[in-house]
Amino acid sequence: MTLQEEIKKRRTFAIISHPDAGKTTITEQLLKFGGAIREAGTVKARKTGNFAKSDWMDIEKERGISVTSSVMQFDYAGKRVNILDTPGHEDFSEDTYRTLMAVDAAVMVIDSAKGIEAQTKKLFQVVKRRGIPVFTFINKLDRDGREPLDLLSELEEILGIASVPMNWPIGMGKNFQGLYDFTHGRVEVYQPEDGKRFVEFDENGEVPTSHPLTKNPFFTQALEDAELLLDAGNQFSEDEVVAGQLTPVFFGSALTSFGVETFLETFLEYAPEPHSHKTVDEEEIEPLNPDFSGFIFKIQANMDPRHRDRIAFVRIVSGEFERGMDVNLVRTGKKVKLSNVTQFMAESRENVENAVAGDIIGVYDTGTYQVGDTLTTGKLKKSFEPLPTFTPELFMRVQAKNVMKQKSFQKGIDQLVQEGAIQLYKSYTTGDIMLGAVGQLQFEVFKDRMEREYNSETIMTPMGSKIVRWIKEEDLDEKMSSSRNILARDRFDHPLFLFENEFAMRWFKDKYPDVELMEQFSV
């Protein structure tokens, strides 16, 4: 198979949603249909030990939340599928935003009872800005929810994207009968008495009149709604979908696996193949460029706690990876050999000999890489566009509870900060270690991982600081430090100030008008 044919097979996408909409459950079902797992673990089965495959970290298994982005791969219907299961909790949006830089499409999961929720809205805006095609799966049809027409209206009114349903629910909750699949010309029956899951349309494009469904009032209502939508609603356009202007909408129940395989088949038919990426000087690097290139969008420590390893996740942008190849690390200008490279099923992994544009590979990292690094070969020398970061709003001092375990404490700090789990600052005057986060849960996960993975208990003390701003090295003067601010450096040794509030920052600006205070967004 040629390089072009291999690349055209790739479908790389992320699943986004508000917490508890069913994102992890639908991920499990997709993996099951892809033959990657035998049985879908359900988030509700936490006490049974039947944990979700994509939630591999201990704290994720216990709490039923995703706090890291898992990468999973399988083959289905002639396609090589790469799923990135992103964190749903808002405290981990930085990791999610970086992950969205590595995909070609997004699947947006919505709870039929709740509609568009806050985190879904935030994530959609990122997807929209990047022009990523969005496919919508409205979940939990086996429970009572809102009217399907209202949910479609919300997509347009709240998210500002046109929608086109690919199927339509027949009833809902205890009255859920199935899905009217006008895309494939059939009805998918929820709990068929005769064991036949699909009822194919006849030559007139209708359910045969002899079938009991035709006398079902819920089916009659669904038929009327569907005909109205087909006549007056948006028409399906593959070009508009790929351009991110139209979202195909699928209904189903991830928990009961109903409608999921039909969704997968249709999604793979219309989802785009790998696309080009821009370098810092606006050059578009196409997937078929023969030179290998890729960027690191995530670093994860301790995927195998037995070996205390660290993996850098690389999205291949162009060309082909071959085991043992030398690549250029653009940030340092040095050559590195990619000899120990893996692909993933959550925490499970296998060595990979080659991979192509669109694939996600894991490179073992001994401290060489940073999130946002670009790897290239041949004539490609430029970095890709920087990945987004968030400015923390919560800060804590941290120290080792046992001073005799300072070495493991420092190793844990270094690795968790490098993977982007939390931000690190060191006081310019006292040397105190301070952490910054966008939400309280980040601190809790940090403390838990330090104890579990590095055997280092920590003492964490809340700080009064609320704002961080960077300054230029040439503006640095230790005399600017006062009771209203803290002078510090970040992990890249850049100088900064932590302020208690807006008033303290305005006071600083008035006293030092020539010092520029900067927000930092890129790695």
From Swiss-Prot:
Keywords for the protein's UniProt record, in alphabetical order: Cytoplasm, GTP-binding, Nucleotide-binding, Protein biosynthesis
Disulfide-bond pairs as recorded: none
Pfam family, one: EF-G_D2
Principal subcellular localisation of the protein: cytoplasm
Subcellular compartments: Cytoplasm
Annotated GO MF terms: GTP binding; GTPase activity; translation release factor activity, codon nonspecific; translation release factor activity, codon specific
One BP term from GO: regulation of translational termination
An example Gene Ontology CC term for this record: cytosol
Name this protein carries in UniProt: Peptide chain release factor 3
